[in-house]
């Protein structure tokens, strides 16, 4: 069973995919979206869902440090409902606090240029979200 991991932003959607055994997460791509206009890249997501026979989605759920849900968390909840309706698969909201910061630190430590980091940060965050979920299962 393959699981898709997503990191939702206002302009991009980071995408990661599990291996068939559900042990590791790999970054797939970053999809350009426009949240303000309701464009969430669903056409591309549909292709990925079919190509990889995805049976579950793990969506990053940004909470405030005190555990409350702010505007970005509410946006993720709304997006989760949209995904469940569009694809008829379970969507798990996974606490993503600090994943983008951790991903950026990893890329800096790997001496990745600022320009390249900007292109891959959301995909890396999606990997960290999905890997955290997979680790919790195993």
From Swiss-Prot:
InterPro entries: RNaseH-like_sf (IPR012337), YqgF (IPR005227), YqgF/RNaseH-like_dom (IPR006641), YqgF/RNaseH-like_dom_sf (IPR037027). It comes from the Bacteria. HAMAP family: Nuclease_YqgF. GO terms for biological process: rRNA 5'-end processing. SMART domains: YqgFc (SM00732). This is Putative pre-16S rRNA nuclease. It is an enzyme of class 3 (hydrolase). GO terms for molecular function: nuclease activity. Its EC number is 3.1.-.-. The keyword Signal does not apply. The keyword Hydrolase applies. GO terms for cellular component: cytosol. It is found in: Cytoplasm. It holds the Pfam family RuvX. Belongs to the YqgF nuclease family. Could be a nuclease involved in processing of the 5'-end of pre-16S rRNA. Keywords: Cytoplasm, Hydrolase, Nuclease, Ribosome biogenesis.
């Amino acid at each position: 069973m393959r699981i898709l991991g997503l990191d939702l932003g206002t302009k991009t959607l980071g995408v990661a995919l599990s291996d068939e055994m559900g042990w590791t997460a790999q970054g797939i791509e970053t999809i350009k979206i426009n949240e303000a206009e309701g464009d969430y890249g669903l056409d591309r997501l549909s292709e990925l869902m079919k190509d990889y026979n995805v049976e579950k989605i793990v969506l990053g759920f940004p909470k405030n440090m005190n555990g409350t849900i702010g505007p970005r968390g509410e946006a993720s909840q709304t997006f989760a409902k949209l995904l469940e309706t569009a694809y008829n698969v379970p969507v798990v909201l996974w606490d993503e606090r600090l994943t983008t910061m951790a991903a950026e630190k990893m890329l800096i430590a790997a001496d990745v240029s600022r320009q390249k980091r900007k292109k891959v940060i959301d995909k890396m965050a999606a990997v960290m979200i999905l890997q955290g979920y997979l680790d919790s299962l195993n």
